[in-house]
Amino acid sequence: VAGEGQISSFQALMSAIASTVGMGNIAGVAIAITVGGPGAIFWMWVSAVVGMSTKFFEGALAIMYKGHDSAGEPQGGTMYIILHGLGERWKPFAYFFAVVGLIGTLCVMQANQLVESVTTVLTTPAGIENTLGLRFVMGIVISLVVGAVISGGIRRISVISAKIVPVMVTCYMLLVFVILCLNFDKLPGVLASIFQSAFSLEAGIGGILGTALTGARRAAYVNEAGVGTASMMHGASRNDNPIREGLVAMIGPAIDSGLVCTLTAFPILIA
């Protein structure tokens, strides 16, 4: 159903996934397995299911309580949900979320991991010294590319995300499937280790809780369910049906924490 907005529901979903699928799905999963063991993956799945319900309310409320920016364009987000849903007396919390959200969405970790990956895969094998100047140049390049995208506003971000994200996820899936096919005989052992570690009686209640907390924390960090960032994208959707937009938003954690993180975990456990 067409309504007031700037982008389609699909573009909103792809933009939300674009902000979550990335370095966290690789480095975050590796950290979760290192700290919590293979069982952390099971609790990431559980957290993904819980995150889907949270994302439903984010998407639905973003459509129910839209606002307009200074240019008169329809916008959505947690700040508008607080302002229009809870009332004027909660307005300070809307400002608080806007400021904290701006700080929390800084891409410091992602940029650092991207530079580390480039230097490890490309520059170091080529004999290029990993200096501060090289990292600075890479940072400038990343800033220019990102700046070229976000300068076009939410419309350009959504259009580019809708084109890149499906290709990115599909290519990642195909590469992982190749690894899994080459190591098919090890998959039963990997699955067994995940469930055994998740409910290991040898580790005791403390060990199970530690594994569960590690998996849940990493999943929440990766899919951003409940953080409030996805509502900004879904609030800009032209869809005027809150329930339908909420159902679309639920796909995000399923792809992010459910699919991509699992595809990352299996090769790590096989190795």
Residue positions per predicted region:
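Inter-helical loop and helix-membrane interface segments of multi-pass membrane transporters/permeases
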Residues: 1-3, 34-35, 60-102, 107-139, ...
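Membrane-interface "cap" regions at the ends of multi-pass membrane proteins
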Residues: 1-26, 88, 238-240
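Helix-loop junctions at the membrane interface of multi-pass solute transporters
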Residues: 29-36, 62-67, 180, 219-224, ...
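Extracellular loop-to-transmembrane helix junctions
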Residues: 34-71, 261
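Small-residue-rich segments of transmembrane alpha-helices in multi-pass membrane proteins
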Residues: 74-81, 165-178, 253, 257-261
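Hydrophobic, small-residue-rich membrane helices and short re-entrant helix-turn-helix hairpins
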Residues: 78, 149-166, 186-192, 223-255
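Membrane-interface loop-to-helix entry segments
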Residues: 115-118, 134-182, 187, 191-195
